[in-house]
Regions:
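Hydrophobic alpha-helical targeting segments used for export or membrane insertion
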Residues: 17-22, 95
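C-terminal segment of classical bacterial N-terminal signal peptides
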Residues: 22-30
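N-terminal, post-cleavage mature segments of outer-membrane
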Residues: 14, 30-32
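Short linear, low-complexity motifs centered on an aromatic residue
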Residues: 1-3, 27
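Gly/Pro-biased beta-strand-loop elements
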Residues: 33-137, 161-164
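N-terminal targeting pre-sequences for secretion and organelle import
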Residues: 152, 157-176
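Bacterial N-terminal signal peptides that target proteins for export
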Residues: 3-17
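C-terminal/domain-terminus segments
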Residues: 140-154
Length: 176
């Protein structure tokens, strides 16, 4: 990993072989992943999503976190609370949930992992509530917006980076 320093922010330039192997059907999007000061009470390894900021923070300790840009739930589809990462999946298949099927009745019953129309992207961290995940995307232009049905979307190279850093059992806190 190479690190570039400016004032008090470090930018990561990481040549992830994993990410290159995982990204299905497309070029990498520019990521704004960076290490930033973080003043919340959270153990290292905790994931904090600040919905209003549209950022995910991975707490690394010493008053710092890695900040990733994300897409979050659109109005009426957001959730707040605490869950745990209960699974890690590479190039997961996607079964559209009922509320998504209701709005998009022509969706197939399952979209295979790695397919260009699979919204899960390169990897997914499933959450203990069973309904949501932190995952990649096939719509990188949605990052930084309120776009999902409640899941947390990341650039594929960012979710690959997070996948490598986070363990099953990690705490996930989603706040306004």
């Amino acid at each position: 990993m190479s690190t570039y320093r400016t004032t008090n922010v470090r930018f990561f330039g990481k040549g992830l072989v994993l990410a290159a192997a995982l990204v299905a059907g497309g070029a990498f999007q520019a990521s704004a992943r960076e290490v930033v000061p973080f003043k919340a009470v959270a153990e290292p390894g905790t994931i904090v999503v600040r919905t209003s900021e549209r950022h995910l923070y991975l707490v690394v300790g010493n008053g710092e976190a890695i900040r990733y840009p994300v897409a979050v739930g659109k109005p009426g589809k957001q959730w707040f609370g605490s869950e745990m990462v209960d699974g890690k999946h590479l190039r997961p298949a996607w079964v559209p949930p009922e509320d998504v099927k209701k709005d998009n009745p022509n969706l197939p019953e399952i979209i295979q992992g790695g397919a260009p129309n699979n919204p899960m992207g390169a990897a997914a961290l499933t959450l203990s509530g069973g309904k949501y995940a932190i995952h990649g995307t096939n719509r990188p232009e949605s990052i930084g917006t309120f776009a999902s049905y409640g899941c947390i979307r990341m650039h594929n190279e960012d979710v690959a980076d997070l996948y490598e850093r986070v363990s099953v059992g990690a705490r996930v806190v989603v706040s306004k």
